[in-house]
Structure formats: C-alpha cells, structure tokens
Amino acid sequence: LLRIQGPIVECQLLETPLLNIINFQSLIATKSARIKCSAGDDPVIEFGLRRAQGPNGALGASRAAYVGGTEATSNVLAAKKYGIPVKGTHAHSWIMSFGSELEAFEKYALAMPNNCLFLVDTYDTIEGIKNAIQVGLQLKKKGHRLVGIRLDSGDLAYLSIEARKLLDGAGFTDALIIASNDLSEEIIDSLKHQGAKINIWGVGTKLVTAYEQPALGGVYKLGAIRDFEGIWEYRIKLSEQIIKVSNPGILQVRRFKNTEGLFIGDMIYNTAQPEDRKRQ
C-alpha cells in the first residue's frame, strides 16, 4: 500500500499512526466495496455514526465508506469535513412526539415539503405506508412530491413488495423505498434474491464496525537499509509462521488487468535489482 523512505528514527515514528489510519480505513473501504457490489446499481448510504467505535472512528469510517462506494453519509460532521454528500431521514422520536403518526407526517410535510421521505415503521409498517400515501396526496395537490419511505424493521422483502404495490396503486410510481436494519452484503444479496422492491440501502452497524472482521492485520516492516557507502542492504523478518515472514527489498506493486480492463492480480516486486543497489 505504501513505501516510506527516510532516516530510520523518523520512519519508525510513523509506524503506529500509519497503521492506525491505514488498517482501519482499508478495512472499512473494503467492506463498503463488498456491500456496494451486492447493491449493484442501487445507491448505498452510510448510516453508521451511532454504532461506530467512538467519534474519531465514526469520522474515519464515513470517509472510508465513501471511498469504498457509498453515495452519501448521515454523519453531518464527516460530510462537512470531507465533502461527502449528506442524506438521512427523520427519527422515530419525531413520530412519537406527536399524537399520531399521521399528524407527525403532516407536520413534517409542512416543514420539509420538498424532502418528504417518511420513516414508516414506528408503530405498524403497513399503516405507516398508508399514512405516508395520504400525506403524499396532500403534497401533490400543493405542487410537491412524496420522495419516498424508509423501512427500518420487520421482513424487509415482504414489506418492500407490499409498499411498492400500495405506492404504485396510489400513483406514486417514482417514490423511493429505502431499507435499513443491520444490513450487510449477505442480507442485501438475500433480499434481492427474494425480489425485494428496495431502491436505496442504508447500511450502518455492519459497515462502520466491519462487523464480521473487526481488525485488519496490516504491518509495517523494514525492507532495506542503506549503509554509510550508499549501498542498499536488504532486510527480512523471519518467523515460524509463514504469514509473518516479510519480503525484503525496495518494494513496489504492479497491477495487471485483462484486455477488458478488469483486475487480474497484483505483483509485488523489488525495484532495486542486485546490479543497481547503489543509489545516488
């Protein structure tokens, strides 16, 4: 991933911060890419701030998830700091703070008429969808549109199919269905296989914590050192565990692709051959 060259003391001081940054964010970016592969052309939004490993972990995770393929984040600070698009929905507490779900949707529509995407599972999801449609019809009369609904619990495949039927039947064929609730690439694959009618995936906990593999074992090892005469001498770390034996040399990575431009593999090679180990 990275090669550092410089005085040995200065290079050593960089080990801990580099590994801390690169290991965690590489892990999250990889997880994000896996999730995006499962989602296909559907947008993925990172929803993980509340479950992330502390404030700094949340910021790094939002950035890495965006690098890995998410379209936006619900983390407002990360959006501001890194220029990531910010998206999200209202909370269950908004619904619960009113006398009824319908009233909550109506008040939200008054405040945000051009951005009405309702969270419909606070009490009863099917009834929530019907209430969202009712408010959507009111919006349509005023020249606005119902952006969509969000499903956050229950059988997401069944509920999304029913939601699509209800929305289409009411004339909201362009309304979006967002799904969340501890999603992962495996769950997204399963939901798609079941024919779920989900347009956007909100992925949080299992993305920002890299749930199935919470740590990446990247290392930082000395590969070569230059003597007082300017000659490079290679160094190798030996171990009874093959995976912990380091590669000596001044290393670089070459990536190979096929004729269609698709990735085949990477080759790690030594840039300094024996005949040119002396560097100016």
What is each of the regions a protein language model found here?
Residues 2-173, 184-187, 193, 207, ...:
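Buried, small/hydrophobic-residue-enriched core segments of structured protein domains
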Residues 3, 87-88, 178, 199-202:
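Short hydrophobic alpha-helical runs that function as membrane-insertion/retention elements
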Residues 165-170, 175, 183-280:
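Gly/Ser/Thr/Ala-enriched C-terminal appendages of enzymes
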